[in-house]
Amino acid sequence: MGLNRFMRAMMVVFITANCITINPDIIFAATDSEDSSLNTDEWEEEKTEEQPSEVNTGPRYETAREVSSRDIKELEKSNKVRNTNKADLIAMLKEKAEKGPNINNNNSEQTENAAINEEASGADRPAIQVERRHPGLPSDSAAEIKKRRKAIASSDSELESLTYPDKPTKVNKKKVAKESVADASESDLDSSMQSADESSPQPLKANQQPFFPKVFKKIKDAGKWVRDKIDENPEVKKAIVDKSAGLIDQLLTKKKSEEVNASDFPPPPTDEELRLALPETPMLLGFNAPATSEPSSFEFPPPPTDEELRLALPETPMLLGFNAPATSEPSSFEFPPPPTEDELEIIRETASSLDSSFTRGDLASLRNAINRHSQNFSDFPPIPTEEELNGRGGRPTSEEFSSLNSGDFTDDENSETTEEEIDRLADLRDRGTGKHSRNAGFLPLNPFASSPVPSLSPKVSKISAPALISDITKKTPFKNPSQPLNVFNKKTTTKTVTKKPTPVKTAPKLAELPATKPQETVLRENKTPFIEKQAETNKQSINMPSLPVIQKEATESDKEEMKPQTEEKMVEESESANNANGKNRSAGIEEGKLIAKSAEDEKAKEEPGNHTTLILAMLAIGVFSLGAFIKIIQLRKNN
């Protein structure tokens, strides 16, 4: 057990080591190139560079402030402006915008001027929005639009806000708030309608792109359209609000809920409604139920009278070929009177004619068929023959049964007798077979004979002799002689006694017993003892089979002669029993030794196998762990 546990633990360690070191290239990403080396500083730099990137869910437009700051940085880089004030730079850009658009200037300068004018107007609208809204307009119309915006920016307050963009005034704040609220929906719609090609959005990562942008765009447009429609129709908006408020009040008010629940269930019906709803009472046994004076929906009709039952029941059929006489007082539960003598004569004539129509073959075939069907039932009597039907036949009486020869009973070794069969035989001896035929359900009367037939007796079944002996001894008990012999012992009865005892004289104690005639015993091979003839059941005793009949009490001399024989038999039996027990014990000891030896052999065979598997597992673990260690050292050197 200890080796098995150790082996399991080593296997667990081996599996975990394989899971860690089976492919170290995946974990450490070991390559020979310098670019892919394990430098943690480079990874941190990449992370810091990726952090400022923002998620771009659509086209992004630069504000005027961002455009102006970007233009100033570009001018400083190009060495055009050095050590200048921000206010002077803005004034210079404003003067360029007042002179009008210059076609020779590049697109970047035009966008810069437009962004400055947009900032002067005080609104956070995109600088390139006009050109994007109307891409087909000529440059002259775009210049006119710019001039209009420039005229709006001529107020002193706007110039102050332009000079100090970081500190806007209160008037500027209010104006910007109003314009931003007014143009919020328009700017959102315009920004969603712009294409990705015209804008310059920042590149997004693959894992940060929006999911189904077209679907989200359509949902947003639909929501905006619904909101606009509701704002245009205040009546619809008011109706929606009122409806929702009414539903909430109806759900939260307890009184309203109780009224709704009460309205769902109708009131219970009254007795009159139930009586009208129930169908009429159906006809019972062919007559209508009488109408009650006080109708009720849960009342049963009264029971019928004798006259109603007599009229409802059919007429009494013919019984045994004659009609029942009409009685003066009709009753539904009255049997017909017994037949008269004339009717009995008619029955006998018809029975004799029917009896003559039957043949022997018909009765034999009928008896065979019934025997085949009733062979599974031991208590069912066999079909009687023609002689038994016409009269008593070969049914034995109690005296004939007692005087039967022992050879008439067939006795086999496998035959068994139950208590029911013994009781049946006793009844046959005393009272005949009437009780048996009644229990079996056989009809004692014969409809085909002119006179009643007595009860029929079944054929005597096979029965063992000892059971019948015990039954007869119950009826006529007798005293057994006091001798040490065991008469019914199976071991002693199998051996034949060669020495015959001498006849003894009658003792005075057994003088009252009836005198019996000694008879010769007969031995049969492979069969149990049989019964000898009985002349009269109350006057004759039973002779024991295969043993001498002892009619008198044994004297002391006889007892002394019988003692050696019994002692020899008992010694032989004890010796044979001891020999058998000794053999059984020795056989059991040998079997136990063989089982122990086989278990030791199997254990010895299993031990080398366990050792070999353990050694192989440990070798495999060592090889894999060594390889993993070498690989880790190489990776550390490369880093």
Curated annotation (Swiss-Prot):
Residues 190-210 have a biased composition (Polar residues). Residues 450-459, 490-509 have a biased composition (Low complexity). The chain crosses the membrane at residues 613-633. It is found in: Cell membrane. Sequence repeats lie at residues 264-298, 299-333, 334-378, 379-417, 418-422. One of its GO terms (cellular component) is plasma membrane. Keywords: Cell membrane, Membrane, Repeat, Signal, Transmembrane, Transmembrane helix, Virulence. A motif (Cell attachment site) lies at residues 360-362. Residues 36-71, 132-212, 285-308, 320-341, 372-459, 474-610 are annotated as: Disordered. Residues 62-71, 423-433, 553-572, 588-609 have a biased composition (Basic and acidic residues). Residues 264-333 are annotated as: 5 X approximate tandem repeats, Pro-rich. Coiled coil: none annotated. It comes from the Bacteria. It is a single-pass membrane protein. InterPro entries: Virulence_actor_ActA. Its main location: membrane. Residues 1-29 form the signal peptide. Virulence factor required for host cell microfilament interaction. It induces actin assembly around the bacteria to allow it to move within the cytoplasm. It is involved in the actin polymerization process. It seems to act as a nucleator that induces the reorganization of the actin cytoskeleton. This is Actin assembly-inducing protein. It comes from Listeria monocytogenes serovar 1/2a (strain ATCC BAA-679 / EGD-e). The lineage of its organism: Bacteria, Bacillati, Bacillota, Bacilli, Bacillales.
